[in-house]
Amino acid sequence: PSLAATLENAGVTDSRPRTLTILVSESDSFKVSIADYLSRTLSGGALTIKVRALPWNDYLTALQNGNFDLYLGEVRLTADWDISPLVRTGGALNYGGYADEQCDTLLDTFLQSESEETARTLYRYLDQSAPIAPIAFRTSSVLTPSGLIDGLTPTASSPFYGLANWAVHFDKG
């Protein structure tokens, strides 16, 4: 359905306008710019989106207390891509209080088997009901043939961390 139809189904009409606020940390000017863009893009008709940029600690407090309509954040997933902290009932990063028993069951099933089928089932379900909307994705990876490099210690922010300590075995590549 269109945005207008979705808003009308939610009771947002010209006679019942709604203002929502996007919470964002003011410490990241890029994220504030994104929030401003989303505000301008999504506002219209009966819907107004405002931006509330807060200092980092106030931002975290507002998230933890649920004092927001929408928020712009960043999550770095663990190596196993477990999204439980975001979408599991009571998850550490589930600031919106999303609770869905079927989602929890699908997460458990996926984490126990990690098959392509359970992943597809989980992601199809989340595509229809997820309380989050990913707007960007980035990965930092180092892929090498087994045994090519000794001493490889990449970090999330620096895939080439400790490069001076690497031993490259060209005969194994």
Q: Residue ranges of each PLM-predicted region?
A:
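Short helices/loops that flank or line small-molecule/ion binding pockets
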Residues: 33-45, 57-68
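Structural motif
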Residues: 24-27, 74-76, 138-139
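Append "and occasionally in soluble cytosolic enzymes with long acidic Gly/Pro-rich linkers
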Residues: 1-40, 121, 171-172
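Long beta-strand-rich cores associated with HINT superfamily self-processing modules
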Residues: 145-173
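Paired acidic/hydrophobic, glycine-rich loop segments that form the ligand-binding mouth/hinge
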Residues: 69-74, 134
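Beta->alpha turn/N-cap motifs
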Residues: 56, 73-78
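Extracytoplasmic/peripheral linker and loop segments enriched in polar/acidic and small residues
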Residues: 48-59, 84-148, 172-173
